[in-house]
Amino acid sequence: MADPARARRLAVRIREVVASTLERGVKDPRLGMVTVTDVRLTPDLVDATVFYTVYGDETARQASAQALESARGLLRSQVGRATGVKVTPTLTFVHDRLPDDAQHLEKLISVARERDAYLAEVRRDARPAGDDDPYRRPRPAAGEVDELSEVDELSEVDEYGGTARQEG
């Protein structure tokens, strides 16, 4: 197992070498606008996974994947020359889904913001359904005294929030 700091430095160096070789050394017409986003190494530094993105649609992505697979030997030899390690890591190319996922999340967030704005607009002009007081109270029968109205007539709220009896 290699030192984690050494593995990070080697991963950065592999990313730089692969990116510059793709830019200058690979002449495959299938290779589109490829960006190397990340390289991850196994703890024993034998296998390297190269993450990349491609500008364009699905056909450009597939064509670039085929071009990267055919250029894997050239890229590995360039990595071996540039890094000088005892065992040159085997390169595996994986399309990086992070930008696609981020774009999808941005769309979802914008849709949620639009819905929130619409609901805020509806809420601003909304009024409660029915009466202002949503609780139903039984109506007193003719001749009966409503207990609540009797208490209201007999008591008064003082300045401290308590009730005081009215003298009459």
From Swiss-Prot:
Sequence ranges of Basic and acidic residues compositional bias: 122-136
Keyword vocabulary terms for this entry: Cytoplasm, Ribosome biogenesis
Compositional bias ranges of the Acidic residues kind: 144-159
GO biological process: maturation of SSU-rRNA
Listed InterPro entries: KH_dom-like_a/b, RbfA, RbfA_dom_sf, Ribosome-bd_factorA_CS
GO CC terms: cytosol
One Gene Ontology MF term: ribosomal small subunit binding
Top-level division of the source organism's lineage: Bacteria
Record carries keyword Cytoplasm: yes
Keyword field contains Signal: no
UniProt-annotated stretches for the region Disordered: 122-168
Pfam family, one: RBFA
Localization of this protein: Cytoplasm
General function of this protein: One of several proteins that assist in the late maturation steps of the functional core of the 30S ribosomal subunit. Associates with free 30S ribosomal subunits (but not with 30S subunits that are part of 70S ribosomes or polysomes). Required for efficient processing of 16S rRNA. May interact with the 5'-terminal helix region of 16S rRNA.
Protein family membership: Belongs to the RbfA family.
Subunit record text: Monomer. Binds 30S ribosomal subunits, but not 50S ribosomal subunits or 70S ribosomes.
Name this protein carries in UniProt: Ribosome-binding factor A
Gene: rbfA
